[in-house]
Amino acid sequence: MKQAMTPEEIKEKKPYLDWSLSEHEYDYICDHLLHRLPNYTEIGLFSAMWSEHCSYKKSKPVLKLFPTKGKRVVQGPGEGAGVVDIDDGQAVVFKAESHNHPTTVEPYQGAATGVGGILRDVFSMGARPVAILDSLHFGELKDNPTMRYKMEETIKGVGDYGNCMGIPNLGGETTFDPCYNGNILLNAMNVGIMDIKDMEHGDATGVGNAVMYVGAKTGRDGIHGATFASADFSEEHATQRSAVQVGDPFMEKLLMEACLELILHHREWLVGIQDMGAAGIVSSSAEMATEGKSGMDLNLNLVPQREPNMSAYEIMLSESQERMLLCVKKGHEEDVKKIFDEYNLDAVTIGRITDDGRYVLHHDDQVVCDIPVVTLTEKVLEEKSEEKKPQRIIDVEQSENWQPEIEDAGQTLRALLNQPTIANDQFVTQQYDSQVRTDTIVGPGSDSGILRVRHTKKAIAMTTDTNGRFVYLDPKVGGQRTVLESATNIVASGALPLAITDCLNYGDPNDPEIFWELHQSCQGIADACEILETPVVSGNVSLYNENNGKAIYPSPMIGMVGLIKNYDHVIPMHMQTAGDKIYLVGKTDDDFAGSELQKMMTGKISGLPHAPNLPGIKDYLYKLQKLMAEGLVQSAHDLSEGGLGVSLAESVFDTDLGVNVKLDFNKNLLFSETPGRLIVSVAPENAAKFEQEMGDAVSEIGQVTDDKQLNISLTNDQVNEDVAKLQKIWKECIPCLMKSKA
């Protein structure tokens, strides 16, 4: 690396502007925090730690809206992952993270390292990762070979990393929209299980205790990855692959086993542990010291390096993967080293804990950093962003909502099943191992993935849900509906919703309209979480998701987990037995704004999606879950994209069954996307009790048949379709698009 600038040259040439640090922030650091000019290494550390990706300096006021406490919450936001009590001294540990910019630039490695990073967040808590989910959002595939390539590589990256780790992928979601053409989204969620007594924290305390670096060696990959994720994205970034990390899942597997052995069997040696994620060593070390109200003194020459002549700046800001930082009690360094030696991993003491609150770095016999550690973590200048309601929303509030003109309901259903967001995503999920570890009860393709908790009768349900169209049209309502969609998916599987994690994917927060979208949608998420009793226990913020000034739809992703106390009561999504009665749960209205139907018929979205009656929906959803636990429900499937028509078809795919349904509404409403609805099937002998308990929240609409036909009678149309032909359309959509020559 060329000779670093002097502090005076930094002041004059302002290289920090390229690292997402403003001139105002630089002056504040000089005048109010350090009372001197920072050197090259120090300003690099400030740039990374004060980036939006690490500090949440713009989004923090909005994040304070979220409810984070609940009777089952053991650990909320602030640690590696959220921890939620699932009874019997056990907890589910989970978190979601975005890796959008790296995946857009280098799809395979961006996706793979996105999975790797979220695994480390979970096992650093003392939990064994048991499941991966992913929320993938691509541009249109048709006439877009670049997007098809990016999709293939992204899926391969997710699959290869998870498969090599031996952790099942239970699905998630895959959507397609032109707004993601220049900036795809990769949100990965990891779920782990642990005994609550084994929970670890990211603390660094105790003067003289060792700071130990464990795992893979440090290289030059990923330098300034945090600031890369905190700036506008443009065509220039298409070649910025040095900011993308390179993953090694086999190394991660060894690291996971070594860390879990240390935590579970020798925790008396350990004070704290944290993943080296965004901003690498500086982030993990500074955060651990701050959490422990301590100082830290590190010798960077002791850091294991895989490349020669690395500068202090490069060592500290590298985001090389498969690395952890430990705080180990003095005198147990060799004990810890022996564990990692058994796994062929580096384990090196690179520094000590101090009590002066200073963050001191040595390199090549020079002190290259000596600053108060809190200046990196707690003295960040929070930025108050301007907000402005977009004119498009003001205009639409004064206009009538779009209503479809459907000629043939059957033809419309066939066309919807051929939309890639609705179509079968087996092209994606078949590349994942969903059965490894042999605990999977329900894998990809259902409303929720479900995994049994070993040595118990319990099961954990999990889902990821995003709908940027609704949030774009009405951010607050869209936020509510996204959380509700997750809760409906969890209940459809027979589980009680417990808590959520999130990935908040938005454009440039310096745009007042985009910040307004962020604020309003987070308010909607908070409102829904409060009412549904699903606190936010972890998550992340990913801003600047734009390409050449064009932002994605505001796309908050909700990852939710639920508890099934007896896995004998897991509810399948497919109809089970001919003769069972079919019920529609929830009321249907003409809700087409942002729907798949609207996009398909008009090529655009418009209008205002309807606000859900959250208290009323919560009442019947949770009542339904209790009846499921009592064995009164045979199957259940939520209604989302494509509405009732699509869900009825999906409920008999891969079966020898059909449905005969009579509806008291018109053909338009067959494809309405009113939220909070499900279709359930109930055995005739349980129907009376089911109806009595559910009351007017349900209406009987038909029965399951054995003729493999989808028969739907409407007030102004009739659908008579062969299930096998519908399924063929649904299954072939994405493979056909991927094989396209255009």
From Swiss-Prot:
Pathway assignment: Purine metabolism; IMP biosynthesis via de novo pathway; 5-amino-1-(5-phospho-D-ribosyl)imidazole from N(2)-formyl-N(1)-(5-phospho-D-ribosyl)glycinamide: step 1/2
GO terms for cellular component: cytoplasm
Binding site for ATP: 56, 95, 502, 539
Compartments reported by the entry: Cytoplasm
GO process annotations (BP): 'de novo' IMP biosynthetic process
Its EC number(s): 6.3.5.3
Keywords from the UniProt entry: ATP-binding, Cytoplasm, Ligase, Magnesium, Metal-binding, Nucleotide-binding, Purine biosynthesis
Residues reported to bind substrate: 98-101, 120, 245, 319-321, 542
Family named by the database record: Belongs to the FGAMS family.
Function in brief: Part of the phosphoribosylformylglycinamidine synthase complex involved in the purines biosynthetic pathway. Catalyzes the ATP-dependent conversion of formylglycinamide ribonucleotide (FGAR) and glutamine to yield formylglycinamidine ribonucleotide (FGAM) and glutamate. The FGAM synthase complex is composed of three subunits. PurQ produces an ammonia molecule by converting glutamine to glutamate. PurL transfers the ammonia molecule to FGAR to form FGAM in an ATP-dependent manner.
Protein name as it appears in the record: Phosphoribosylformylglycinamidine synthase subunit PurL
Organism per entry: Lactobacillus acidophilus (strain ATCC 700396 / NCK56 / N2 / NCFM)
Gene: purL
